[in-house]
Amino acid sequence: MAAARASLGRIFPESSILFLCDMQEKLRDRVLYFPQIVSMAARMLKVARILDVPVLLTEHYPQGLGPTVPELGAQGVRTMSKTSFSMVPPLQQELDKLPQLKSVLLCGIETQVCILNTALDLLDRGLQVHVAVDACSSQSEMNRLVALARMQHSGVFLSTSEALTLQLIKDAAHPQFKEIQKILKEPVPEIGLLGFFQGMNNPLLPNSRP
């Protein structure tokens, strides 16, 4: 019965953490929908701060790819530089300090590289992984979509920033609901995934067939 509950992917502020992956200056003009996915990741960061969800951020080889873009609003967030294609090695010690951790909420770039490898490493640790698909992207749409399918088949929960936010607060009677509602009322940008999720041959859909 416990295993069945775990597979539902429920999330709680006290047992979750937000990972923000490699949203850096030199990738601004290379990654599809970069401004849009950064804006959605910024929303997740605002929500995490309101709900006291821990946040960790990485920068991939910042000497070459530059710093995190300022519009993410991540000033003051613990930041680690890395060369690995996973966030887990540089954040290992931070994860070990959180024995209550069960769920990782994952945003950033690129989907087929650091998001995918981070997700797999976290699954190996026995953690649930929730990828905010509206806060992840790649330089190639094919790489992005195949990586999302690959992650779901491996046990990652694909969700949206809004869905994850509402899962965290669970009730309109939540004391921070009004503050969070202001964030949710902001316009949601187009990020190019709607047609993919509607496709009859979409591998993410359980009843899809060739």
Swiss-Prot record:
Keywords: Cytoplasm, Nucleus, Phosphoprotein
Alphabetical list of SUPFAM superfamilies matching this protein: Isochorismatase-like hydrolases
InterPro entries assigned to the protein according to its UniProt record, in alphabetical order: Isochorismatase-like_dom, Isochorismatase-like_sf, Isochorismatase_domain
Pfam family, one: Isochorismatase
Signal sequence interval, chain numbering: none
Keyword Metal-binding belongs to the record: no
Compartmental location: Cytoplasm; Nucleus
CC per GO annotation: cytoplasm; nucleus
Gene Ontology biological-process entries: protein destabilization
Major site of localization recorded for this protein: cytoplasm
Residues carrying Phosphoserine: 7
Family note: Belongs to the isochorismatase family.
PANTHER family for the chain: HYDROLASE, ISOCHORISMATASE DOMAIN-CONTAINING PROTEIN 2B
UniProt subunit comment: Interacts with CDKN2A.
Listed name of the protein: Isochorismatase domain-containing protein 2
Naturally occurring in which organism (per UniProt): Rattus norvegicus
Organism taxonomic ancestry: Eukaryota, Metazoa, Chordata, Craniata, Vertebrata
This protein's encoding gene: Isoc2
